[in-house]
C-alpha cells in the first residue's frame, strides 16, 4: 500500500512540475523580432499606396495637364543590387505640381521578402522604399508612390529604382550567381507628373510650345501653313521651319504643311508675305510689319494659337525660320514678338565663331 501511494505521489509531483515548466516556457516565449514592425509597416504602405493611387487618377479625371513617362517595355532587375533608370523631360512651360510613380512588378517566390526591398530616387535623392512582395501565383504587385515635387526640375529628371534582393540571409556572394533573385518591372509602370502651364508660356523663348508639347509630342495637332497664294520663298521658309522643329520632336514627325485655307487645327504656324496674308491674320499683329526684315509674333484668335511670320521681302521669311531653328537665340526672346533682319543669322554665327576663337587664343604666362 505504501509503495503504491509513494508511486502515485511521485507521478503527481512530476505532472505538476511539467505543467509549471510548460507555462513558464509559454510566458518566456517572445514574438520574433520585427514581425510586428513588418506587419505595421505593411499596413502603412498599403494605406499610403491607396492614397497615392487616388492622387494618380484624380487629376486625370479632373482634366488636369499631366505627362506619363514609361520604360517602354518589361524591365528585369536581377542580382543582389540592381538599378533601373528612367528619364523624364519637363519643358520650360510645364510647372510640376505633383508626381506619382505607379510601379507594377512580379518577383521570384524564392526571394526572402523580409530583407529584400525596392528604394526610389529622384535626381539622386531617395524618397521612398518598400519591401518586395513575392506571390506564388505569379500575380503582379501594384504600388503607388508619391514623388516630392520639390525634387523635380526643368529639363531632364532621373528616376532610379534600386533593388536589393536576397535568397539567403547569410553573408557571402552566392546570391550573385543565382538566377532566381529577379524582379520584373511591368510595362504598365509609369511616372505621372501633373503640371500647370507657365504664366509666360506665350513668350517666344517657350517655342516650339504649344506646337510641340507633352500633349502633342509628334506635332500631329499642329500645322505649318502658307498663304493660299504662296510662292517659292514662302514654301522654302515653311519647310525650314518644319525641319528646325525636328530636334524637339519626341516621336515621328506628324506635323503637316498646308495652305492656310486647309489649316484645320488649333495650333497654326503661319509663314507668308504681307501681300499674301489675309486681313484677319494681319489684324492679330500688335506691331507693324517692317519694310525690311520680318515680324515674328505669337497670337491667339478664339481657341486657335498662332505663330505668325510675316514679311515684306522674301529673304526675311527664311531669316525668321533660321532664328526659330536656333535654340540658343530663341532662349533669349523673352517677349511675344520680335523683329528679324536679313543677314542676322550669319552675323550671329560669325560672332559666335569669333568669340570661340578669342577664347581659344587666350593664354596665361603659365601656359606659355
Labelled PLM ranges:
Residues 1-2, 45:
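Generic cytosolic/nucleocytoplasmic N-terminal low-complexity/intrinsically disordered segments
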Residues 11-12, 26-27:
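Short, low-complexity disordered leader/linker segments with a strong preference
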Residues 2-11:
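Bacterial N-terminal signal peptides that target proteins for export
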Residues 27-368:
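Solvent-exposed alpha-helical segments and adjacent loops
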Amino acid at each position: 500500500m505504501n509503495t503504491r501511494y509513494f508511486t502515485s505521489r511521485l507521478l503527481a509531483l512530476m505532472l505538476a512540475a511539467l505543467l509549471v515548466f510548460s507555462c513558464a516556457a509559454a510566458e518566456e516565449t517572445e514574438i520574433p523580432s520585427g514581425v510586428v514592425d513588418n506587419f505595421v509597416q505593411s499596413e502603412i504602405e498599403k494605406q499610403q499606396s491607396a492614397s497615392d493611387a487616388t492622387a494618380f487618377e484624380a487629376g486625370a479625371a479632373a482634366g488636369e495637364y499631366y505627362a506619363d513617362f514609361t520604360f517602354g517595355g518589361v524591365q528585369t532587375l536581377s542580382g543582389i543590387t540592381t538599378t533601373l533608370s528612367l528619364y523624364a523631360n519637363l519643358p520650360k512651360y510645364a510647372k510640376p505640381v505633383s508626381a506619382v510613380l505607379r510601379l507594377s512588378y512580379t518577383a521570384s517566390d524564392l526571394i526572402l521578402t523580409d530583407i529584400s526591398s525596392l528604394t526610389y530616387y529622384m535626381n539622386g535623392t531617395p524618397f521612398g522604399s518598400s519591401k518586395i512582395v513575392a506571390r506564388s501565383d505569379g500575380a503582379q504587385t501594384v504600388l503607388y508612390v508619391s514623388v516630392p515635387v520639390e525634387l523635380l526640375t526643368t529639363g531632364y529628371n532621373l528616376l532610379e529604382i534600386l533593388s536589393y534582393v536576397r535568397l539567403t540571409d547569410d553573408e557571402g556572394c552566392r546570391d550573385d550567381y543565382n538566377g532566381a533573385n529577379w524582379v520584373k518591372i511591368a510595362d504598365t509602370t509609369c511616372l505621372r507628373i501633373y503640371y500647370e502651364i507657365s504664366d509666360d508660356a506665350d513668350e517666344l523663348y517657350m517655342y516650339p510650345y504649344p506646337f510641340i508639347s507633352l500633349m502633342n509630342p509628334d506635332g500631329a495637332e499642329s500645322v505649318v501653313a502658307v498663304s493660299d497664294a504662296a510662292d517659292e520663298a514662302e514654301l522654302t521658309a515653311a519647310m525650314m521651319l518644319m525641319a528646325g522643329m525636328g530636334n524637339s520632336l519626341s516621336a515621328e514627325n506628324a506635323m503637316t504643311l498646308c495652305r492656310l485655307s486647309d489649316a484645320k487645327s488649333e495650333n497654326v504656324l503661319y509663314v507668308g508675305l504681307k501681300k499674301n496674308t489675309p486681313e484677319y491674320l494681319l489684324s492679330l499683329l500688335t506691331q507693324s510689319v517692317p519694310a525690311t526684315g520680318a515680324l515674328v509674333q505669337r497670337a491667339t484668335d478664339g481657341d486657335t494659337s498662332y505663330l505668325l511670320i510675316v514679311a515684306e521681302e522674301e529673304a526675311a521669311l527664311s531669316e525668321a525660320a533660321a532664328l526659330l531653328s536656333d535654340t540658343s537665340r530663341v532662349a533669349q526672346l523673352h517677349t511675344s514678338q520680335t523683329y528679324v533682319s536679313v543677314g542676322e543669322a550669319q552675323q550671329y554665327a560669325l560672332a559666335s565663331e569669333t568669340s570661340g576663337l578669342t577664347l581659344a587664343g587666350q593664354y596665361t604666362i603659365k601656359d606659355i
